Amino acid sequence: MKLNKEKILQFSKKLSENTLMETLNIEYIEVGEDYLVAKMPVNPKVHQPMGLLHGGATVALAESVGSAASLLFIDTDKFEVRGIEISANHLKSKREGVVYATAKIIHKGKTIHLWQIKITDEEDNLISLCKLTNIVLPKNA
């Protein structure tokens, strides 16, 4: 990694300004050599009609943390990241509290990054398991 952990978390927070991530109150909280962790509050703003965490909000959290994590491995002055495929298995429901997304790299190629994102609750129960594929493109491509 080119930056220290605090600078990486500040950079990730800045990326969220005026975006869906800010709307969903996604906050990046931990970073390591091969992972990034974010959290999102579960409240009526992210519910589906039955009062449960919406799968789309969960997927938005997963793609956000996986895409931000890919930025850790590239020169952001020369390259940018785009999500090209995401899948999710929703395993447990959640009504309120906080969910955590931990993105861990599975494959780090020159142009393709594959991430596994585990969405867990405060007790580390697995809520959803997601897979994200990102492509690394030259800027202005």
Language-model features and meaning:
Residues 1-141:
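Terminal targeting signals and extreme-terminal segments of soluble enzymes
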